[in-house]
């Protein structure tokens, strides 16, 4: 079929398999050009490995450290009338390129919150790898099906305490608007912590530990974002922030356990990037368009793969073997460049000035839109989008 982009709300409902493969290859080539990670991991489990930071983590481990990787995700293959999800094609491309280099690659397509996902991962690790020396937890899901009761819990992207009103961009109409978001109820806050907090990360690590599939020096990392006062009302001081604070709680608990055998658990605070997850958060697209323009001008711009490469090389697996630099809460900070005062001051100055008319001039909004489409395999250089492509892509994946 010939596949064109179709946008609905915060997602593109179509995907291009060849474009997705090209995106993955671009990240692989970046990783290879960086050279090998000195003390990198060799057997890695990535929970949430099909897009964004999770995919970049899998690529960095495999192509930067020759690691065997097991990826867990929840994606949809193609049907007779519809292409598969971008994460399906990303994972298929990763599998193809990893196997071509003789690297172990297996994937599990399932609900990562379920007991079954954990048991299947343990089974494959025991069967193929013995143990893993790194676990990356990178789930971004709006819903969690509770593994025991089957109850569906939903997260909320809302402020706490009072209605939040701010200048934002309507990404469908390319208009500057005033966005208002009602505050979360106590129940919505609790539910957001249940879905996006640290509990499931702990359950994964507990299951892996009890099964004896964690090596003595196993490192685990989960991803977070803090930002600044520009986004705090909707993010760090909102319901989502409470969940991310719970991730910190989980990291401390896990670190206490893992450090006994020379392992570690950290939250890595990353910069804002264009992902399917961030595009759904009110105000984030406008902030990202602003901050990207300034960071590009300063030569500090990074996407997912650059961030994760820096985390592996300069934080977790330093060439000199020394411990990672952490903040006062034991977090790895990769948002350091974004948080530089001159970058943030630029955004503070720009925010009141942005209008629909000057949006493209004052910010990198055009580039934001291009990057958003690229997530789904569109607008990638060198791809013929008029060509007939086969949407049915199979690979080494166990579906539960």
Swiss-Prot record:
It is an enzyme of class 1 (oxidoreductase). The keyword NAD applies. Substrate binds at residue 225. GO terms for biological process: fatty acid biosynthetic process. Keywords: Fatty acid biosynthesis, Fatty acid metabolism, Lipid biosynthesis, Lipid metabolism, NAD, Oxidoreductase. NAD(+) binds at residues 48-53, 74-75, 111-112, 139-140, 244, 273-275. Transmembrane segments: none annotated. Pfam families: Eno-Rase_FAD_bd, Eno-Rase_NADH_b, Enoyl_reductase. It catalyses: a 2,3-saturated acyl-[ACP] + NAD(+) = a (2E)-enoyl-[ACP] + NADH + H(+). GO terms for molecular function: enoyl-[acyl-carrier-protein] reductase (NADH) activity; NAD binding; trans-2-enoyl-CoA reductase (NADH) activity. InterPro entries: Eno_Rdtase_FAD-bd_dom, Enoyl-CoA_Rdtase_cat_dom, FabV-like_NADH_b, Trans-2-enoyl-CoA_reductase. The record marks 75 as: Plays an important role in discriminating NADH against NADPH. The active site is at residue 235. Its EC number is 1.3.1.9. It comes from the Bacteria. Monomer. Belongs to the TER reductase family. Involved in the final reduction of the elongation cycle of fatty acid synthesis (FAS II). Catalyzes the reduction of a carbon-carbon double bond in an enoyl moiety that is covalently linked to an acyl carrier protein (ACP). This is Enoyl-[acyl-carrier-protein] reductase [NADH].
